[in-house]
A protein has these predicted regions:
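C-terminal alpha-helical "lid" subdomain
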Residues: 125-227
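Conserved Walker B
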Residues: 57-59
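Substrate-gripping "pore-loop 1 plus following alpha2 helix"
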Residues: 66-87
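A short helix-turn-beta junction within AAA+ P-loop NTPase domains corresponding to the substrate/partner-engaging
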Residues: 105-121
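Structural recognition of the conserved hydrophobic beta-strand(s) that form the central parallel beta-sheet
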Residues: 54-55, 91-98
Length: 227
């Protein structure tokens, strides 16, 4: 199974949720430097089956061959392990990627390797409204026009909204330090959210915006929704 979507849409959270629903199943997680140990990890999974092998950011080892010089031995290791699962082996591969467009065709399209792909899209308006409520925590979110805030965040991810509220709280605390005590919820208004949004959309924060999953629509939010 392949989970794909831009950064910040919740792929890692989804993996954790799925694994939490599988009691008694061995989980082998490959991420970062551990990606170099594909064969060893799969051997452990076969020994301790039923098992799930989670390969995070699989695009790091499975990019199109044309993007790299020479062959990718890690890619071949992964393909060999996925091909080598017989009907008597209870091992499932769960892959995640931010860049499905870069995946090796042999990995993404051949039946038996990845037989189900699920996109985690950016949240729609209703989901963004729920995320505002979820991430406000103990903040006193005093918004005069919540619908405008939701409209102005079209195209962003859950991570973006979480960071937006964090920065808005900092703006509010800087504005009135006396109101930012540990026992008093910080009051965040439309003005604070707008100021935080301007920070995130600043051209000098382009990398931060990308990492948080700020979509194309955010480019126009500095001046409000198009009309």
């Amino acid at each position: 199974m392949l989970l794909y979507g831009v950064p910040g849409t919740g792929k890692t959270h989804t993996v954790r949720y799925l694994l939490g629903r599988l009691p008694g199943v061995t989980v082998v997680l490959l991420s970062g430097r551990a990606l170099r140990m594909i064969s060893q990890a799969c051997s452990v999974a076969r020994t301790l089956q039923p098992a799930v092998v989670v390969v995070e950011d699989v695009d790091l080892i499975a990019e199109e061959r044309g993007h790299n010089l020479g062959e990718n031995p890690l890619l071949f290791e992964l393909l060999n392990e996925m091909d080598g699962l017989g009907s008597d082996i209870d091992v499932t591969f769960l892959l995640t990627t931010n860049r499905a467009d870069l995946l090796e065709e042999a990995l993404a399209a051949r039946p038996g390797r990845v037989d189900h792909a699920a996109e985690l899209p950016v949240p729609d308006a209703a989901a963004r409204a729920r995320l505002l409520r979820l991430y406000q925590g103990r903040l006193d979110l005093a918004l005069a026009d919540r619908d405008t805030v939701i409209a102005r965040t079209e195209g962003v991810t859950a991570s973006f909204i979480k960071e937006l509220l964090r920065r808005a709280a900092l703006v509010a605390a800087d504005e009135d330090p006396a109101d930012a005590s540990a026992d008093t919820p910080i009051r965040v208004t439309d003005a604070h959210l707008n100021a935080a949004l301007e920070q995130l959309l600043d051209t000098r924060s382009a990398l931060t915006l990308t990492l948080l999953g700020g979509g194309p629509a955010t480019a126009r939010t500095a001046n409000g929704p198009a009309g």
